[in-house]
Amino acid sequence: MKALVDTSLLVRYLTGDPPHLAEKAAQVLDGEETLGITEVALVETAYVLESVYGVPRKEVVDALLALLQKENLRAVGGDKDLWMRALLLCRPSRRVSFGDALIWAAALASGVKRVYTLDARFPEEEIAVGPPEDPGPG
């Protein structure tokens, strides 16, 4: 692998906007070169597509799933299968953020049974979530 891709390249590729940059992005992503993608780029791309471009959640997830299935794209510092599982978790609901879904999937994959969070919307499927228990007075 000679290069990683960043959010701007992914957004141009997925939106086609603006066309001259989308074409450059397509040349890179649709080429033969093996490329790396990070979890940060994935989460940022999801955020930009949803919040800046107004793409519906299901379409964002479907686009990112298709992207992750590209043969020449490798996960750097993560696991593509885990990322896809997280995306599928947040596809049907705006309640679960992409970031929280990735944390949830990482907990499941690593065998961790609890996630400390103060977020009432954190996914609870198959794990315990909530604030740390108060240890009481010193």
Predicted features along the sequence, with ranges:
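Alpha-helix capping/helix-boundary segments
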Residues: 9, 41-42, 82, 102-103, ...
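Active-site neighborhoods of divalent-metal-dependent phosphate/nucleic-acid chemistry enzymes
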Residues: 73-113
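Acidic, PIN/NYN-like endoribonuclease modules and their adjacent C-terminal/linker elements
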Residues: 104-138
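Short, well-structured N-terminal submotif of metal-dependent ribonuclease cores
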Residues: 1-37, 53-62, 120, 134-138
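Short, conserved active-site loops that position catalytic residues or coordinate cofactors/metal ions
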Residues: 39-47
